Structure formats: structure tokens, C-alpha cells
Curated annotation (Swiss-Prot):
Pfam annotation, one family: Trans_reg_C
Gene label: hssR
PTM comment: Phosphorylated by HssS.
UniProt key word Transcription regulation: yes
Subcellular location: Cytoplasm
Residues annotated as domain Response regulatory: 3-116
Major localization listed first in the record, in broad terms: cytoplasm
Keywords, in A-Z order: Activator, Cytoplasm, DNA-binding, Phosphoprotein, Transcription, Transcription regulation, Two-component regulatory system, Virulence
GO annotation, cellular component aspect: cytosol; protein-DNA complex
Keyword Ribosomal protein carried by entry: no
Protein name: Heme response regulator HssR
Residues modified to 4-aspartylphosphate: D52
GO molecular function ontology, one term from the record: phosphorelay response regulator activity
Species for this entry: Staphylococcus haemolyticus (strain JCSC1435)
Amino acid sequence: MVKCLIVDDDYKILHYVSQHLEAAQIQTVTQASGESAIAYLANNKVDIAVVDIMMTGMDGFELCQLLKNDYDLPVIMLTARDALSDKERAFVSGTDDYVTKPFEVKELLFRIQAVLRRYQINSQDIIKLGNVTLIQEYMELSVDSKNVNLPTKEFQLLFLLCGQPKHIFTRDTLIERIWGFDYEGDERTIDVHIKRLRHRLNQLKATIEIQTVRGQGYRVITHV
């Protein structure tokens, strides 16, 4: 069962959202502050977080950044603020989606399901390329006898590239396939993830390489 963390300092909203998500077979955990949410995550795992922006103490923007950077969690921001600048700041903070109050819980549910589909792991899929094996079930990169569990986005990016070796993927395609078509953040996030992957592959002495094709994008090739 999917487990959703809901963070809002309005207890009525916590109860309202939790009640409806539970009815849709989504397990929920509610926290009334960003600080308590981080404390909970120190010893517990969830699949997705729904975060209110306007909270006392740690606000939703700061919490979203922590959830993305430290836990690589999918996040949907929930707020009464509809200004374009707020939406922009939300996406810069790393949110996967944005819902404005008042809202229909069905809409929130649809968005949760859509975001989770982008993060979904198919346990049947294994890719072997050169001396590299990628196992989706565990988000595991294996090079010879060395195993590394990758962050979700890094794994999804490498899995996509390795699934079609020599195929050139544009930045736009990679962003749409991994972050979603409605992603409004900086496209340079692709470059950051590629740099990290290259470093990992180099350290593990992998026989695959992520190449930059000038003016086009990225592809994976193998070295014998």
C-alpha cells in the first residue's frame, strides 16, 4: 500500500485529506510542522509527501527542498496561494506538482497517482550492458561484484539511457520522461545528475560511458 506523508499546520486539512486518501486505499501519516515531518522520516519511510506552503517555523519551500535533497521523495505542494511567483518558487524548490486550495480531493488523488507513476519501479526489469547490471526493484547499480544503491532520479536516468544504448536523448526528452512534462525547474538539473553518474561509473570502473553529443543531448556507449 502506498504511504503518504501529509504536512500542514491546519488540523482540519490534515483530517480532511487523510480521511479521503485512506478511503482510496492510501495509507497516511500526518504531521503539523516541517520539523516534526523530518523527525518522523529519520526512522520511517513514505512513498510521497503532500506539503502545505504556509506553515509556522519551517515553511513548505524549505521542507520541500529537504525532502527532495535528503530523501529523494516525490512532493506535491498544497497551498491557498495562487500567485505565479509562488508556483515558480515551489517548482524551484523541487516540487513535482502543485495544488491550489480550495481543491477537490479527487484532483489531489489523481495528481498523487500521476506523480507516483513517474517514480514507479517495475520489479521485472533488469538491464545488462557491458559489465554493468541495473536492477529496478532495488534501484541497484552493479559493476562486476560491486553494488551501489542509487538515488531514484539518478537510477531512472541511467536506466533510461542504458535501455537504448547509442540512442541520443535530448535534455527535453530526459526531463519529460524522468521529471514529467509539467516540470518547470532548471534543465541544468540533468547536467548535475549526469555528472554524478559519470563520477560513480568512473569510480566503479564501469565499461559504459555517458557521452555528451554536442547540441543534441546524451547517450550511453560501451567500451570493450
